[in-house]
């Protein structure tokens, strides 16, 4: 199993990053993709990935930080993308739930990053919240120019999942699916996702699975808990855990072009 969404740059991991990574590998995680959410965090994620085995990173500007996007941002992403650790452009996309950056700023930054990914022939690591239709509209002209794309931390409806899958996207599933309050719809649509389009992630330190027993002493999520998420996904999909592990690992290799 491979965690495609770990925010290892988070201050919540500042005091024990080495231990967090070690616990993940001890728990059977085979690799980690460290998320870059703005230019500073993307540089930090690349540096962290450089320091650990079986770690890679993304480089991009999250919709929350889109107001910071400039021509210099593109130059920084080009530079980071040339490094061996960076295997995807992102996290980029749209978030109309909070609008920490205006919709206009978000759309400009998203489109610019899609263009960079297409030019560099790199996959895209994407975010979408409360912006499904506009997200697909902006993505559409670039679909055939991208080698692949994943919508990480998918929490949408069955119809939204089908529309994303019909456009060739991979879907990243987190511990949100373990939440008996908010995750029931996601749980029910899991069988809709073809095995060769499913990716798994923790989005740690966020989204600690609510159904872990015993509950961890800390509310901080960790990549070491990925196995619990995968176990639950396999159960709700009616699949064998080992088969799901093997398939999602193969999906990671295919999408990101990495070996682990």
Curated annotation (Swiss-Prot):
<comment type="subunit">
    <text>Monomer.</text>
</comment>
<dbReference type="GO" id="GO:0008310">
    <property type="term" value="F:single-stranded DNA 3'-5' DNA exonuclease activity"/>
</dbReference>
<comment type="function">
    <text>3'-5' exonuclease that prefers single-stranded DNA and RNA. May play a role in the H(2)O(2)-induced DNA damage repair.</text>
</comment>
<dbReference type="InterPro" id="IPR024918">
    <property type="entry name" value="Exonuc_TatD"/>
</dbReference>
<comment type="similarity">
    <text>Belongs to the metallo-dependent hydrolases superfamily. TatD-type hydrolase family. TatD subfamily.</text>
</comment>
<dbReference type="InterPro" id="IPR018228">
    <property type="entry name" value="DNase_TatD-rel_CS"/>
</dbReference>
<dbReference type="Pfam" id="PF01026">
    <property type="entry name" value="TatD_DNase"/>
</dbReference>
<dbReference type="InterPro" id="IPR015991">
    <property type="entry name" value="TatD/YcfH-like"/>
</dbReference>
<protein>
    <recommendedName>
        <fullName>3'-5' ssDNA/RNA exonuclease TatD</fullName>
        <ecNumber>3.1.11.-</ecNumber>
        <ecNumber>3.1.13.-</ecNumber>
    </recommendedName>
</protein>
<dbReference type="InterPro" id="IPR032466">
    <property type="entry name" value="Metal_Hydrolase"/>
</dbReference>
<keyword id="KW-0460">Magnesium</keyword>
<dbReference type="GO" id="GO:0005829">
    <property type="term" value="C:cytosol"/>
</dbReference>
<feature type="binding site">
    <location>
        <position position="91"/>
    </location>
    <ligand>
        <name>a divalent metal cation</name>
    </ligand>
</feature>
<keyword id="KW-0963">Cytoplasm</keyword>
<keyword id="KW-0540">Nuclease</keyword>
<dbReference type="GO" id="GO:0000175">
    <property type="term" value="F:3'-5'-RNA exonuclease activity"/>
</dbReference>
<dbReference type="InterPro" id="IPR001130">
    <property type="entry name" value="TatD-like"/>
</dbReference>
<keyword id="KW-0479">Metal-binding</keyword>
<keyword id="KW-0269">Exonuclease</keyword>
<feature type="binding site">
    <location>
        <position position="152"/>
    </location>
    <ligand>
        <name>a divalent metal cation</name>
    </ligand>
</feature>
<feature type="binding site">
    <location>
        <position position="127"/>
    </location>
    <ligand>
        <name>a divalent metal cation</name>
    </ligand>
</feature>
<keyword id="KW-0378">Hydrolase</keyword>
<dbReference type="GO" id="GO:0000287">
    <property type="term" value="F:magnesium ion binding"/>
</dbReference>
